[in-house]
Amino acid sequence: MNSKGQYPTQPTYPVQPPGNPVYPQTLHLPQAPPYTDAPPAYSELYRPSFVHPGAATVPTMSAAFPGASLYLPMAQSVAVGPLGSTIPMAYYPVSPIYPPGSTVLVEGGYDAGARFGAGATAGNIPPPPPGCPPNAAQLAVMQGANVLVTQRKGNFFMGGSDGGYTIW
């Protein structure tokens, strides 16, 4: 086939002797203390009775930046009621980010495959799951603002997330 011959053989990689790795094999960490009580019930976490009336004042916060947190952690010097192991840390409510009666536009909040026909619940924004921070639409609804949510645009080339596929 080829009159020039074969390609030269490449030398093999030299075998490395086994040595001590650079990282430690075992890392000794202190063990966390075991739980003594069951976690608090869901209803206890959202009961507005952690701070006694008159024990604390509510700090004011500017709504200059919409990404700001809705709650500030409570100062350590504030006198609160008897704390047990089942009561979580209390938070001060902060002034609303969205004024009541204002309208908030959430662009691309609905999927491109979302359908709004008879029986659709397009006007219902569900609360955030436990342990998850609320999104902009949920914050606006919680503060009494109106919310307009638009559909995310989908096209043939970018595809959609409605479960379909394109055959090339």
UniProtKB/Swiss-Prot annotation:
Signal peptide region: none
Region annotation (Disordered) ranges: 1-25
Locus of motif PPAY: 39-42
InterPro entries: DAZ_assoc-2
Main location: cytoplasm
Biased composition (Low complexity): 1-13
Gene Ontology terms describing biological process: positive regulation of RNA polymerase II regulatory region sequence-specific DNA binding; protein destabilization; stress granule assembly
Keyword annotations from UniProtKB, A to Z: Cytoplasm, Nucleus, Phosphoprotein, Ubl conjugation
Compartment list: Cytoplasm; Nucleus; Nucleus speckle; Nucleus, Nuclear body
Post-translational modifications: Ubiquitinated by SMURF2, leading to proteasomal degradation. Ubiquitinated by NEDD4, leading to proteasomal degradation. Following DNA damage, phosphorylated by HIPK2 which promotes DAZAP2 localization to the nucleus, reduces interaction of DAZAP2 with HIPK2 and SIAH1, and prevents DAZAP2-dependent ubiquitination of HIPK2 by E3 ubiquitin-protein ligase SIAH1 and subsequent HIPK2 proteasomal degradation.
Phosphoserine PTM positions: S77
GO cellular component, one term: cytoplasm
Superkingdom to which the source organism belongs: Eukaryota
GO molecular function annotation: p53 binding; protein serine/threonine kinase binding; ubiquitin protein ligase binding
Pfam family, one: DAZAP2
Subunit and interaction comment: Interacts with SOX6. Interacts with DAZ1 and DAZL. Interacts with IL17RB. May interact with FAM168B. Interacts with INCA1. Interacts with EIF4G1 and EIF4G2. Interacts (via PPAY motif) with NEDD4 (via WW domains). Interacts with transcription factor TCF4; the interaction results in localization of DAZAP2 to the nucleus. Interacts with transcription factors TCF7 and TCF7L1. Interacts with transcription factor LEF1.
Functional note: In unstressed cells, promotes SIAH1-mediated polyubiquitination and degradation of the serine/threonine-protein kinase HIPK2, probably by acting as a loading factor that potentiates complex formation between HIPK2 and ubiquitin ligase SIAH1. In response to DNA damage, localizes to the nucleus following phosphorylation by HIPK2 and modulates the expression of a subset of TP53/p53 target genes by binding to TP53 at target gene promoters. This limits the expression of a number of cell death-mediating TP53 target genes, reducing DNA damage-induced cell death.
Protein name: DAZ-associated protein 2
Natural source organism: Macaca fascicularis
Taxonomy of the source species: Eukaryota, Metazoa, Chordata, Craniata, Vertebrata
